[in-house]
Amino acid sequence: MVAEAKPFIERYGIKKVEGFFSPLPCELYEGEVNGATLNVVLNGQQQDSDLIGCEAASVATLSAIQRLHPDIVVNSGTCGGFQKNGADIAEVFIGNEVMFHDRRVPGDNTWGTQSLGNYPVWEGSQALAKALGMKMGKVTTGSSLDMQPCDLEIIEKHGGELKDMEGAAVGFVCSLFHTPILYVKSVTDLCDSGAETFEEFSRNLHKACESLKVANEKVIDYLVNNLHA
């Protein structure tokens, strides 16, 4: 979303590349950080609102990898967390695993296993989190902002901690291209707080995006220094 990316874009002063993905709605912002190329890709907009969810994220990721050939993809955005796991509003986590939580397909080791995803994350994620003093958690993805009891059942069964709407879709595309992916997630709402999800999300979005900006700066500096050393 623009709200998630804008503070980061403004921090680095990177510029929009008009029409790069045309006719697709995805948007590219490009710049340089300490000699490394930094590309920020947004899903784009339709009907005057940000495109969110798995479909838009898949299109943007596929297009970006095919056109830009990145060394690593960073899926940076907001998420829901759980009080019982120690999450706080605007706290930023690094993802250590990723899967879908709303694909209810029977059949272990066939469609059921495939539908959950469990795609690989960048092997350097743990070292980065340790170096930056950030917690880690398992990202689970669904196509709705709220969470149904059946979603929670899957999340708890598989140890999910960070609930979003795009992460596993991005991970799926990255797995097809064998492109490393790093997850950086800032908490906007606490799924077990009893508060209405959209209201809590809206109330905390700005705060979460500001903390995400700070974390992104640290992450980019780390990646530039370690991937291009």
Protein language model regions, located:
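A structural motif corresponding to the C-terminal end of an alpha-helix
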Residues: 33-37, 68, 128-134, 170-179, ...
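Metabolite-binding pocket within alpha/beta catalytic cores that recognizes anionic/polar moieties
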Residues: 1-119
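Active-site rim beta-loop-alpha module in soluble metabolic enzymes
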Residues: 107-162, 168-177
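Glycine-rich beta-alpha junction loops
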Residues: 80, 98, 143, 188-190
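Short, well-ordered amphipathic alpha-helical segments that serve as non-catalytic structural scaffolds
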Residues: 60, 64, 122-125, 208-219
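Conserved active-site and cofactor/substrate-binding residues in soluble primary-metabolism enzymes
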Residues: 3, 52-59, 68, 165-168, ...
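His/Asp/Glu-rich mid-to-C-terminal helical/loop segments that flank catalytic regions of hydrolases
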Residues: 193-229
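Active-site-adjacent mobile loop/cap segments within catalytic or ligand-binding domains
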Residues: 154-163, 168-206
